[in-house]
Amino acid sequence: MDLVPGILHADLDAFYASVEQLLNPSLRGRPIAVGGGVVLACSYEAKAFGIHSGMPGRRARELCPDIIFTGGHFSEYQRLGDAAIAVMRDYTPDVERISIDEAFADVAGSRQLFGSPEDIARTVRRRVRTELGLPISVGVARTKHLAKIASQVAKPDGLVVVDPGTELEFLHNLPVELMWGVGPVTKAKFAEAGVMTIGQLAQRSPNSVQRLLGQAVGEKLSQLAWNRDPRAIETRRRARSAGAQSALGRRPATERVFKPVLLHLAERIATRLRAKDRPCRTVTVRVRFSDMRSVTRSLTLPASISATTPLMEVAVDLVRGVLADYREEKTISLLAISTSNLGQDSVLQLELPFGLADDGLRPGTRKGAARGRADRAMDVIRGRFGWESVAYASSALGEKHSVPDEFRSLAEKEL
C-alpha cells in the first residue's frame, strides 16, 4: 500500500441548507430547514438547537421558534453538486461519486502535476468556496473508509489529513457511529454490548461481533475497525438501484393522499430509467407511519419495466397491501419507491396476443407499448421545455397537496 494518503473524501456541508443560504443571503447565519412537515436538511445554526434531518417540522419549531422553513430548489442542488464534482475531476479522473453532495477521489497519481494530496484537498476546498460559494469538508487518508471518517471529523468546513503511522490512534478514539454502515440500530446493539468507540470494537473478537450483527456485517466492521479496507475508487460504477422518496409530515393513510405521491415518485424514477435504458424488474416501497415505524414490500416482475404508469400501479398495489396489514395505522409520514434488478439496454420485443390479457404491466403488449410511447413523448417535451411543461393530470392536480419533498438526485444523474 502507498505510504502517502492519496484518497480524498469530499462532503459538501449541510448541502441543501447551504444552497438555500447561497440563493438567499438573508438566510445566512440563521437557523433554516428544508422541508415542511418533516425536516429534510437543516443549517448548522438549526443543528445547534438539536434539530436534525427526519425530525417532524412541529418538533423543530418547538426547539427553535425562529427556524425558517424553505421548500427547496432541487434543480440548484443538482447543478451545484455537479459543479463541485467537476472541480474534483480537474485534478484526477479517478472520482467516485456516491451521492449528490459527496465523492471519493484518488489523487495519488496527480502529485507531479498538482502537489501533495493535502495540497490538492486545500485547492479543491478553496475553489468550491470561491467559485460556488459553498462550504466543503475533506478527509485525506490511505483508505476510503478512513478518508470518509476524516471528512466527518473535519466538519464543518474543514480539512483533516490522517498520516501513516497515526491511523489507528486517530481511528480508535472515535465513536463507533462514525463508521460507514453503523446506523442507529447497529449503534444501539453496540451500546448494549458495551462498545462505544471504534477501539473497543477493534478489541472484540470477530466471532463475537458476527454473533452480534450477523456474519457479513460483523466481519466487515471488524476489518474496518483496523483500517483494513482494500476497496479502490470505482470510476465506472453503475447504480444497482434507483429510488425517490417523499416526506409527508402527518397525512391520512388514504389512497387519495398516497396515490398522487406515488405517481410523482414513479415519474421521477421511470424518467431516469428510460434515460439510461435500464428498466427494472424489482419494485420496493417503504411506508413510514407517524410513529416512525417503517414497513417495506417488494415485488419482482416477470418482465422489466421503465414506463411510469406500470411502476406507479405496482407501487400502489404494494402500499395497499401494507395498509391492509396495518389497519390500525391512520397516518403516514413518508413514502418511498426503489427499483432494482436493473437491466441493460432495453430492447422491446412485441408479444403476440394469443388470447392472453393485454396486460399494461408487460411492455411488449399493445397497452404496454402505448404507455411506453406516451412516456417517451413526455420525456422529449420535458427535455426541451422543462419538467413542469407536461405532467399526468392526477399528478399535476394532486401536486399542491402531495408534492414529494426530497429526491436524492445522484441516482437521477448517474445511473
What are these regions (language model features)?
Residues 1-226, 231-233, 271, 359-415:
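Gly/Gly-Pro- and Ser/Thr-rich, intrinsically disordered tail segments characteristic of DNA damage-repair
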Residues 9, 171, 178, 186-332, ...:
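DNA-contacting surface of Y-family translesion DNA polymerases
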Residues 14, 109, 142, 289-291, ...:
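Non-catalytic surface loops within mature trypsin-like serine protease
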Residues 38, 73, 246, 289-291, ...:
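A broadly conserved detector of short glycine/acidic/proline-rich loop/turn motifs that flank catalytic sites
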Residues 98-102, 141-144, 278-282, 330-334:
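Short Gly/Ser/Thr- and Asp/Glu-enriched loop/turn motifs at secondary-structure junctions
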Residues 285, 337, 386:
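Hydrophobic, well-ordered secondary-structure elements that form the walls
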Residues 305-383:
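C-terminal hydrophobic structural anchor segments
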